[in-house]
Amino acid sequence: MNVLHRTRSNDAAQGIRGENRAAITKTWTFFDGFWHAGNVPIMGPRTHAAWLGSMVFDGARAFEGVTPDLDLHCARVNESAARLHLKPMVKRETWMALTADGLERFDDNAELYIRPMYWADSGTAGGIRHDPESTRWCLCIYEAAMPKPSGSSITLSPFRRPTPDSAPTHAKAGCLYPNNARAIFEAQARGFDNAVMCDALGNVAELGTANVFMAKDGVVYTPAANGTFLNGITRQRVIKLLRHAGVTVVEKSLAYAEFKTADEIFSTGNFSKLSPITRIDERPLKPGPYYTKARALYWEFAHS
């Protein structure tokens, strides 16, 4: 596809305000048939998604020359679009081909975030319901260093994950993330790195930024995917890898009290992949053998 190699300079993208320039890492975005450098504008003040949140995305990773589960991420953004009544017009194979082309614009071993997106450009009369036929899309790839697995602290959040009948939890929709953000703000104000969020019934759902696992007495546990949180691709991959290696992994309802007495806790997510939890409330923890095994198995899978 010749369109993959077209590049257009964008005055607005190059004219990033000085105080923000350092915050924008190297970025390439495929939008409207061209690759654009920098933080290219994709929406305006009348764009439906800009003021009413009709947007979905997905996130894959490139690191050490690999892009694990890229195909699943490309498929999921289309599933999310359909679930939010957007029109998923880009085939999975096209997302993947565009990604391959975009990666050529970075160093071979660059640590990158790969973000395909769909959003509604316009709404119907009254404004609330968007017009599916106005769906637009882009693919944004940018440098984002893999966080060091040095450990983080967590605490229980007063904010909860929404139920499937109160928010579009079955899609990776941008409108879901401000709720997680306020949980993280609140936890960090109390001196913690991340927040443990529960569902409406009071069972642990996830962290503010990732899925969460714990180990106790030789068994690994993780909250059952009940529709209140994203059943992450990295989460699913780690469960499969651990089970294939002979580790018992149980998906069930878990109380916060169970995490407070766990032998070890770790998180999984696309941005960091696997990270150890080294403190829950005031109780210190060490990276444990199941975290270490899961991380090693995942890296082996990623490079296979």
PLM feature spans:
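Helix-start/capping segments and mature chain N-termini
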Residues: 2-93, 97-101, 119, 124, ...
